């Protein structure tokens, strides 16, 4: 076993009963068999579903982990991992298969940390967003020649340059006024993107994701938004300008969580390049347009970072175990970050759930909205904040909230109908695309957690 920092020892000790896994590259059929194997081993906490097909008809499979798979539980956050967006960048794909087996085995072994994670979180794992590109790259195998072979999808399109460009609209709105969140898509967006991109967009619109990471290769660094430079400068021998989001401090913290839990990312010097703390603003490294992490932030409630995980885009099979051991703790710690900040229900005077209510934090020019079940999640660093909830036809309500370092603060909002507006209220429907609705659990565990972290109503 490679030498690893002492911080890895607790998780390694908890993992002594894990069934040995094979560290090898998985072609498409093998990937599907592996996902089904994990699902069959842990049917009570997993669901295997697909979000669409690739250009060549391969399914984009997602493995979900939850104590109620297929169900959104109000106040339980949704988090996702996406791998293999570029077909020739394969480490993320293999890490996510390893992570899936690890979560299943550790749950069966009653690892308390993993039990708590799966009981309190709905986790979605998409190992390969670009299975067609992967098959092209895998036919070549680990080889430094043909560096970009298989990067694009079967239509020759780079999927990380294929999302609707919402940055331009946001930069304009920031200067002249306009929405700072959930920017609308053009009417013809479906005809402008590839099948894989369309599938992912429909997926992230159907579930209220809170946190995400997108895995790449060719460097070792945690990259956070924005990817597109305000100055519209693109990759050159010199770094472009930093383009921070309104949540820049939070994004830097999320990136550092992964970097410092990783075996060597935090050291900075990797792959012949240097990134302080092992993190970088995307545009500060090089500017790209129509990327996925910026799209998540500007169109949904989801905060996504991009993880560059290996110097070699297609590492040799013999390197996979070392890479897994170097990333395992970071993968778990990043998932746990979804449980910070504030969350709660937005209700009307009759205790009906309100969907689409806007949650604003004074001093941070980026809002989130309540989901279809009336619950909202707002990632925040520890501190004291002024938070406002507002919905059409209702009087806004503002409270002062203190966020601590251990777990989210629960803050519910009950809004009174406005006496000056007569707009109809939009109530949360009972069911949403891709999942069943479930009433909030009243278990002692969640009641006690709510009491510990409840903020002002």
From Swiss-Prot:
PANTHER family: CARBOXYPEPTIDASE N CATALYTIC CHAIN (PTHR11532:SF80), PROTEASE M14 CARBOXYPEPTIDASE (PTHR11532). Residues 24-338 form the Peptidase M14 domain. Keywords: Carboxypeptidase, Disulfide bond, Glycoprotein, Hydrolase, Metal-binding, Metalloprotease, Protease, Secreted, Signal, Zinc. The gene is Cpn1. The lineage of its organism: Eukaryota, Metazoa, Chordata, Craniata, Vertebrata. Zn(2+) binds at residues 86, 89, 216. Its cofactor is Zn(2+). Protects the body from potent vasoactive and inflammatory peptides containing C-terminal Arg or Lys (such as kinins or anaphylatoxins) which are released into the circulation. Belongs to the peptidase M14 family. InterPro entries: CarboxyPept-like_regulatory, Peptidase_M14, Peptidase_M14_domain. Its EC number is 3.4.17.3. This is Carboxypeptidase N catalytic chain. It is found in: Secreted, Extracellular space.
């Amino acid at each position: 076993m490679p030498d690893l920092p002492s911080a890895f020892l607790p998780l390694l000790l908890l993992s002594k009963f894990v069934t040995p896994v094979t560290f090898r590259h998985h072609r498409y059929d093998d990937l599907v068999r592996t996902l089904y194997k994990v699902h069959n081993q842990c049917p009570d906490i997993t669901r295997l579903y697909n979000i669409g097909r690739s250009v060549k008809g391969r399914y984009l499979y997602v493995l979900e982990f939850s104590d109620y798979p297929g169900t959104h539980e109000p106040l339980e956050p949704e988090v996702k991992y996406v791998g293999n967006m570029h077909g020739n960048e394969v480490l993320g794909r293999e890490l996510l298969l390893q992570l899936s087996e690890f979560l299943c085995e550790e749950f069966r072994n009653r690892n308390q940390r993993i039990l708590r994670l799966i009981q309190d979180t709905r986790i979605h794992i998409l190992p390969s967003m670009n299975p067609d590109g992967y098959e092209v790259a895998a036919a070549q195998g680990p080889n430094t020649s043909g560096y970009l072979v298989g990067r694009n999808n079967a239509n020759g399109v780079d999927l990380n340059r294929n999302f609707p460009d919402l940055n331009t609209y946001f930069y304009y709105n920031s200067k002249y006024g306009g929405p700072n969140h959930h920017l609308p898509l053009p009417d013809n967006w479906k005809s402008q993107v590839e099948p894989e991109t369309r599938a992912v967009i429909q997926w992230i619109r159907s579930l209220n994701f809170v946190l995400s990471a997108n895995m790449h290769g060719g460097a070792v660094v945690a990259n956070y938004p924005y990817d597109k430079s305000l100055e519209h400068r693109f990759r050159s021998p010199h770094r472009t300008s930093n383009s921070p989001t309104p949540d820049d401090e939070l994004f830097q913290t999320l990136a550092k969580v992964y970097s410092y839990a990783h075996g060597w990312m935090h050291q900075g010097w990797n792959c012949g390049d240097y990134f302080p703390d092992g993190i970088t603003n995307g545009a500060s490294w090089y500017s790209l347009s129509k990327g996925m992490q910026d799209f998540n932030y500007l169109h949904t409630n989801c905060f996504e970072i991009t993880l560059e995980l290996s110097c070699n885009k297609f590492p040799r099979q013999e390197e996979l175990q070392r890479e897994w051991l170097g990333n395992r703790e970071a993968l778990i710690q990043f998932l746990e970050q979804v449980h910070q900040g504030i969350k709660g229900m937005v209700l009307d005077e009759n205790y009906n759930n309100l969907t689409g209510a806007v949650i604003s934090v004074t001093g941070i020019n980026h809002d989130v909205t309540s989901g279809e079940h009336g619950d909202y999640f707002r990632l925040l660093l520890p501190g004291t904040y002024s938070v406002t909830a507002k919905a059409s036809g209702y009087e806004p309500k503002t409270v002062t909230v203190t966020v601590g370092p251990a777990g989210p603060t629960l803050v519910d909002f009950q809004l009174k109908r406005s006496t000056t507006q007569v707009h109809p209220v939009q109530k949360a429907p009972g069911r949403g695309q891709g999942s069943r609705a479930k009433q909030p659990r009243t278990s002692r565990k969640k009641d006690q957690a709510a009491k510990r972290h409840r903020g002002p109503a």
